[in-house]
Amino acid sequence: MQSTIVNLLQRGAGHAPAIFAPDREPLRYGMFREHVTGVVAALNGCGLGRNDRVAIVLPNGPHMATAFVSIATGATAAPLNPSYRAEEFRFFLEDLNARALVLMADSESPARAVAAEQNIPVIELEPNKNVAGLFELHSQRAVSSGSNASIVADDTALILHTSGTTSRPKIVPLSHGNLVASSRHIGETLALSADDCCLNIMPLFHIHGLLAALLASLAAGGSVVCTPGFNALKFFAWMAAFKPSWYTAVPTMHQAILTRAPRNRGT
């Protein structure tokens, strides 16, 4: 069995939904697989390939989810907190030695100016307005030629940083094999199946949201509702609209949900 992130998508039936989002049609597995292939080709066209580090600064939601999977399949994904200030982006982009930065086409993030300072090409993501997670990539500038070789299990899929609470944040590289094994283990532990739907309220620049919510669901052939992020006021409306079978969160979120629950009894 292949142990790369893109192979997780093979579990889902072509017509089955993979990604849901408010106010959009679901992205189905067959289309998701085609989309990943197209994004990898677009990255290669920009001169990006295997093990090239691509920083991602996108808001939480379906496009962040599909961008992570697609970019990790063709290069190395390095998601960053979109709320960072310029000085934080300056540190992380330099520390990553990023070969490109992916931003929403209309983004006014300070990461754009920092990328210009560091001579990092910006690739703009133009979202599809109808289907959750579909997008096109546009770049005004090519990167020097990268490797178009196929990704293997030992290649780095994801780069995160430690919190840096006691010292300088350190790079944590995670391989395809590591992420695939962990996501399958989570799925087996939770007995996830293709019938399960996860309501994701976790940020997708942290391992919790990327692994426990997104990849574990895809590994089971299930679906994920990609919300803009945690909002206790909207949580029960999302539950009613999408009828997920499970969600995952940190203790402070659980507490906020429990506090709000009595007002939403019966919804």
Regions found by a protein language model. Name each.
Residues 59, 103-110, 230-231, 244-267:
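Adenylate-forming
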Residues 108-153, 260-263:
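ANL superfamily adenylate-forming
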Residues 28-30, 150, 157-184:
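Conserved AMP-binding A3 loop
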Residues 41-87:
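Conserved AMP-binding/adenylate-forming
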Residues 6-28:
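AMP-dependent adenylate-forming
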